[in-house]
Every structure is written in structure tokens, then in C-alpha cells.
């Protein structure tokens, strides 16, 4: 799923004639699931890594995780060096981002403000849809079609 998310980020940005390389991405959430501080085996970490490797400038906001390691195995054995520090969510960070990427749907994110201030939003958790927030600047993952339909 991380590769699909990163590819979709590229498609969304291409829609405004912008490349993923050099774009500013604001990733909201790094933990494994909402409202916890555990990021072990979180696909959000892999998404962060892939975005970085694609040349995007990524800021991460997560009110539950203050610092994370891309390679947790290295952190366990002391080989990781400094971790990636998350930032507090501010209106300035939202406004500076070319794309806001919601990867963990924490309860305390101000979703209405995010949707109003962001240039583009890619909501992988349906956090905005759940709150009935809609806009032509909000993108979601395609809903898979059941083979039984």
C-alpha cells in the first residue's frame, strides 16, 4: 500500500502540473493507528521513506509521536543516529505544503481547518469523509470493487 499512496501523491501533483520531486508534502500521522504513540511496523513510516526517496520535502506532524526512526531495527541496535522529529501542526505548515497527506486519522487533528487551508489533501484514512468534509481539492484512495458485486 505505501507504493500505491506515493504513486497517487504523484498523480495528484501532476494534475496541477507539479512533480513529486521538489514538492512540499505535509504528512499527518506516523503512528500505526489513531491516537497511539506506537509507530512500529506502521506503513506511514515506509510512505515517508518513499516520499523522501522520490525527492519530496516531507514534514511530519503527529501529536502522539515526537520522534521516529525510519529503520527501527537500526534504532534498536543503536545504529540509527538521530531520528526524524515531528513538528507541531500549524496553519503555516498547512499553507506551505503543496499536498497534505493524511496517513493516520488522529482524533485531535483540526480537519475542518486542514481542509480549508490546504492547497490539496490526499486523505488515505477517510478522516474528512467521515466528518462530511468535501471539496474538489480532497482526494481519496479508490474504493476497491468487490468481486461478488
Predicted segments — roles?
Residues 1-149:
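Structural/interface elements that position substrates and couple domains in central-metabolism enzymes
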Amino acid at each position: 500500500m505505501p507504493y500505491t499512496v506515493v504513486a497517487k501523491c504523484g498523480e495528484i501533483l501532476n494534475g496541477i502540473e507539479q512533480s513529486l520531486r521538489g514538492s512540499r508534502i505535509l504528512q499527518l500521522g506516523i503512528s500505526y493507528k489513531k491516537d497511539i504513540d506506537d509507530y512500529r511496523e506502521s506503513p506511514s513510516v515506509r510512505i515517508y521513506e518513499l516520499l523522501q526517496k522520490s525527492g519530496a520535502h516531507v514534514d511530519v506532524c503527529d501529536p502522539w509521536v515526537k520522534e521516529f526512526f525510519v529503520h527501527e531495527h537500526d534504532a534498536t541496535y543503536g545504529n540509527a543516529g538521530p531520528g526524524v522529529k515531528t513538528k507541531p501542526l500549524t496553519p503555516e505548515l498547512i499553507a506551505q505544503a503543496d499536498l497534505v497527506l493524511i496517513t493516520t486519522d488522529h482524533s485531535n487533528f483540526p480537519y475542518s481547518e486542514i481542509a480549508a487551508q490546504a492547497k490539496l489533501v490526499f486523505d488515505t484514512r477517510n478522516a474528512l469523509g467521515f466528518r462530511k468534509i468535501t471539496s474538489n481539492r480532497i482526494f481519496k484512495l479508490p474504493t476497491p470493487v468487490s468481486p461478488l458485486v
